[in-house]
A protein has these predicted regions:
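ATP-dependent carboxylate-amine ligase catalytic core
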Residues: 1
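C-terminal boundary of histidine-terminating zinc-finger modules
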Residues: 106-119
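Conserved catalytic-core segment of NTP-binding enzymes
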Residues: 4-104
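Alpha-helix boundary/capping detector
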Residues: 40, 110-111, 149-150
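C-terminal accessory "lid"/substrate-recognition subdomains
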Residues: 51, 74-100, 116-151
Length: 151
């Protein structure tokens, strides 16, 4: 389930209604976005909510122009999510670049994740990391239960 950044009623409602296997927090590398990611991670880790954080994904990690596919421009900062993952002892599941082909492919019904490109590879690596993280969570932890609210 894709949720808005931070912590809000929608996050609480979700964990009250659905036994969530785990949370994957997505952020861009700049400080203001990382602050929201920290709040989200902290919320899921509270004793009352107790939803395992499976990992962190850095979106828009760098910009790569189509005409210079090997160039990386860190327009939102560099390695913000990697540093946060290390600090909070969670897995960095992947880094997704900001490239025009993502938008174009989506608009044309051609997902870049299926292409043999740097971006396609990033999405494939992310998918493998997510599967491994879920497998690890399921081996090491009991199933998550819905959050019970007492009145």
């Amino acid at each position: 389930v894709d949720l808005p950044p931070g912590t809000s009623d929608i996050h609480l409602t979700l964990v009250q209604e659905v036994p969530v296997t785990g949370a994957i927090v997505v952020s861009t590398p700049q400080e203001v976005a990382l602050a929201d990611a920290i709040k989200g991670i902290a919320m899921f880790r509270t004793e009352k909510i107790n939803v395992p954080v499976l990992g962190l994904v850095e979106n828009m990690s760098w910009f790569t122009p189509a005409e210079l596919p090997s160039n990386k421009y860190y327009i939102f900062g560099k390695e913000g999510c990697r540093k946060l993952a290390e600090k909070m002892d969670i897995t960095l599941l992947g880094q997704i670049p900001l490239v025009q082909s993502i938008c174009e492919g989506s608009d044309n019904g051609e997902p870049v994740a299926l292409n043999d490109t740097v971006t396609g590879s990033a999405f494939n690596e992310l998918a493998v990391s997510v599967v491994k993280s879920i497998e690890k969570r399921n081996r090491e932890q009991r199933p998550t239960i819905k959050l019970e609210i007492s009145k």
